[in-house]
Every structure is written in structure tokens, then in C-alpha cells.
Amino acid sequence: MTPHRTPRSRRTVALSAGLATAAAFAFLPGTASATSADVLGAKDAASAVTEAAGTPLSYVVNVRPGKGNSAKVKKAVGRAGGTIVQAYDQIGVIVVHSSNDAFAKTMRGVKGVQSAGATRTAPLPAQSTKDVGTPKALTGAQAEAASAAAVAGEDPLQPLQWDLPAIKADKAHEKTLGSRKVTVAVLDTGVDDTHPDLAPNFDREASVNCVTGKPDTADGAWRPSAEESPHGTHVAGEIAAAKNGVGVTGVAPGVKVSGIKVSTTAGFFYTESVVCGFVWAAEHGVDVTNNSYYTDPWMFNCKDDPDQKALVDAIVRASRYAERKGAVNVAAAGNSNYDLAADSIHDTTSPNDTTPVPRDVDPGECLDAPTQLPGVVTVASTGAKGLKSSFSNYGHGVIDIAAPGGDSTAYQKPAPPATSGLILGPVPGGKWGYMAGTSMASPHVAGVAALIKSTHPKASAQRIKSLLASQADAVPCTDPYDINGDGKVDAVCEGGKNYNGFYGVGIADALDAVTKKK
């Protein structure tokens, strides 16, 4: 069996220095390199895995709309050697396990099936792998200095949070902290709801474990284990860490946050888990979902590949369902410094659950899910100086909005008393640590969306997205963009001040979110 690659699907980047638990991140635009497998085509690599006799895989089968189709397709699943794990009849997606190597091909020939495909190239269950890195832990000296600098009304670590004033969240909090009737769901690696910065605002009823593609509602199933990444806990804190005299403050510290665990222990975000997560959010009153990941094993899912097309079809159905139910879906743009509007991108990481096979893809035809899906708010990252982060993906017509996600202090140094260009947030075990990535930018926008929902409780998801865009602070292109000062252009921005490929409509504005009625 081919060994698993270290999963890189979370939208964080690894740091050279790290402490504490598992997963914080650096400023290297491309982290994966080509392998000896580049003599094969990508499709050949995938089929080489699935054609092994009796390989157990997970699949999604997408049913065509039409009376009676669901029942017929379910019967066909059994005849094709599949076992139904979960049927999401509300969106026509069926999660299946099968050891029949021809299962997907057989199902694609069944009347009433729109698409069907394997959600992974690795056999069930996925092998365990180590995480990418560790958070850069907050030191005792930093905490003491921050606490001494805190003014009345601030949480003790808030002076280190340069990201809050960058979106005017500190000013917004003088008006309101957000509504307890608003919930943001974090689809991620799990959330430690016992953390003192998260416990006051945690919504247990809207939390679940979706890793298998079927909701696990056992108490605490949404939490990460000790071996798993703190990523989801950090993201949740950026959104809604309570303003309670402890630790940090979230963008919307008065709203609720839930944990929807969609990542395996090995760190993979598979389609069945993501579909389950969106459907759960849709049916449990969630107002905003945050998605700081890409769906494994393909960084880009190509429409001309029947398996990859099926994965996109399933996630589109689920995310649109969540939006129809009132949720605004926010997603991280990614950390490869890719131009997502380019004619071609060289993908060296896919499939990431077996042996990657380098390939050239057209990002207009091969989609990063959920980042590039219709209706999703796609977020680019900025650093402490308000410039595009060195790692952040970009692209005219792809990026919707920008927010702080951090960057190396060598590139963008914050003003004192903040000392790190990264984003500070909670990590499991009652600790706090620094992380960076578009993973950190996305929850800032999710938090602002939650503040807008708090101000406009009857607003539809579409209306909230419209306000998010109209209230953003426009930022012109950074031209030339030479973030490391070596005299070479590191990325090219297209567009004008009011919209461009680096910052979209601009940087999210939390103060406008709570003060503007239109």
C-alpha cells in the first residue's frame, strides 16, 4: 500500500519555529514538490489505486431530480456492491462504501444518476499521519507584557491582536458584541469547547462529528483528540472568543460558535464529511459557516474527470442547500500564492492521500472546493501592514474580500505592543498560540458576517453577502508586489481600487457591520 502524504488541506502555512500541540504554519508559497510519479498521468495514478482487487473506497452518488429516482438509485447501489452509509435525500446525495472496483463506473450508467465518484484514492480507513507543524505558542513574557498593556475593557491578550483594529473590530465592540441568536459553524478539525475562551459561547446543539459522512451526535464528538490539529479551535476563537477577561477576543465575541468536525484523525477533509457538515449546518439554524480547508484528495477537481466532477457536484448541492436555509458560506482562498484566475496552474500535491502526480490544471475548469464554488465568499489574506500575505492565493474574479491572516514579521511587522505578524488564538488545553494562513483570514470575515446578521436579524444570506461587500474598505492593487524586497515581482494584481484580484472588494469592516443600516 502506498504511504499517505502529510495532509495539507487546512488553509494554514507552517512556521519554522513552533511549540505546543499540533499545526501552525510558515510562509513558503509552495510546500509540496514533484515526485518520481510525474511519468504517469493524474488519472492513471488514481485508477492504479482503485483497480486493485477489492479495494474498499468511499463514494458519493448524486441522484438526478425526479420522482422515484432516489429509490431506484438506492436499489442499484446494492446491486453494484455498495453499502449505503448515509442518504441525504434533501439534496440527492448518497454516501456509499464499496469494494467493487467498478462501482462508480457502474453507477454512472444507472438511469437517475447524475454523477458518481470515489471520494478518495486511499483505501478505507485512511492511514494516520503526522501533522504539518505546531502552533507558535504564546510565551509567559508575551502574555505578561500584553496584560500590562491592556486598557479597561480589553481582554488581557487583546493588545497582541493587531488583526482586530485592522478590521475595526475593537471599535465595533464599543457598539455591540453581536447577538446570542446568531451561530457560526466551524467546519474544521474539531473544536475544544472546554477552552475558557470558547465555553461561554459554544453552541452544543449545532455541533457534531461528520467525519464518516454520517452525523455522530455523541456528546463531545466534535472535539479534536490530543493527537489532532488545534486548527479548528483556533479558528473558532478568532470568530467568537468571549470577551470575558480571559485570553483573546473574537471578531464577534457575543455570538455563538459551533464545531462541525469534518477532518479525519490524519487530517483529511473528504467529500462525504464536507457534505454532511453543510447539511447539518443547514438543518440546525446556522447563520454562517467557516471553511478553512480544501476538500481532499484533489486540490483542484476537474470537470472532465468523472470522479472529481462527482465530488464537486455533491459539495455544490450541500453548500447551496445551506445557503437556501439562510447560511452564508465563507471559505479560505489557499496558501500557495497561486493566481486562481490564471490559464494554468501546476498542481504538485494531488492526490494527497496517496502519491501525488504533478499535473497542469485550468482553474476555470478544475475547481478548488469549496473555495471556488458558486455562492461561497472567497477570502484572501492580508498581513499587519495591510498588504496581501506572501502566501495568499489571489485572482481577479475569484477573490471576493480580504481580511487579516498574518504574515512573516520579516515582510509585515505589526505596530507595538503586538510583536508577531501572526494571528493569536486559542488552542486546546486552555492555551493560546499563533497561526497564519488564509485559514485565519476566513474566520475574520465569518465574524464580520455574524455581526451583520446580528444587526440585520431578518436578512437573507444573499443580503448579508451584499452588505459584507458594500461595507468593505476598498484597497487598490499593490503594484509592484515585491513582498520580500528582492527586486522581483512576487505576484501581479489585476483590477482597480474598488475591486481587484488581491483584495476583492477590500478588507472586511466590522464597525460598518454594526453601525450601518444599509
Region annotations inferred by a language model:
Residues G153-G254, C276, E283-A310, N335-S350, ...:
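Active-site core segment of subtilase-fold serine proteases
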Residues H4, A37, K74-Q158:
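Autoinhibitory propeptides
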Residues A53-V63:
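Short glycine-/aliphatic-rich beta-strand segments at the starts of folded cytosolic domains
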Residues M1-S36:
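Secretory targeting and sorting signals
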Residues V262-A369, L373, P426-H444, N500:
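Substrate-binding/access-modulating region of protease and related hydrolase catalytic domains
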Residues L40-E51, G78, K130-V186, K214-E228, ...:
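N-terminal domain-start motif of subtilase-like serine proteases
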Residues A37-A52, V85, V286-Y293, H456-K518:
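C-terminal subdomain of the subtilisin-like protease fold in secreted/lumenal serine endopeptidases
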Residues D353-L451, A508-T515:
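Extracellular S/T/G-rich loop segment that most often corresponds to the catalytic His/Ser-adjacent loop
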